[in-house]
C-alpha cells in the first residue's frame, strides 16, 4: 500500500478525503470530517458528499441519488473503492465488524493503536498507514473504522473514517 501517493479532495469547508487507489483488488481510503457527536450522521453526510463528487459518473448510468445507488445493488457488484462501500456505524469487539460496517474505536483500543487517548490528525494519519498489515484494523475488506481526532486544546475537532473496500 502506497500511502505517500494520497489524493486530497476538499468537500465543503473542512471535510477531506485522502485516498489510495490500487488498480485491481482492494483500495484503502481515509477521510476526515468535522467532529459530530453522531458518528452515523457524520458518515451519512460524508457519503452524500462523496456521491455528489462522483454524481456525473453515476448519473451517466441513470443513478441520480445515493439512495438509488444503494438500492440498485451496484456497489455489491462493482464496489466504489471509497466510503460509499460502507453504510453503518457499529460498536463491537475488534474484528467483529461485517461488510458495510464502520466500527467506532474508543477507550483502551485508541490508546493501544495511537499511543494516546486523544490522537491528533498527524498521529492518526501516520498510524492508519498500517491499516491492512494484519494488526491494525480493519482486518477485512468491505469495512472501516472511525475515531475522534483531537486539536491542541484537547477537544475533539474531527472524525477520521478509514477502511479497505473493493474486489
What are the residue ranges of the model-derived segments?
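Proteins with a high burden of low-complexity, intrinsically disordered sequence enriched in S/T/G/P/A and R
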Residues: 6-10, 18-27, 145, 149, ...
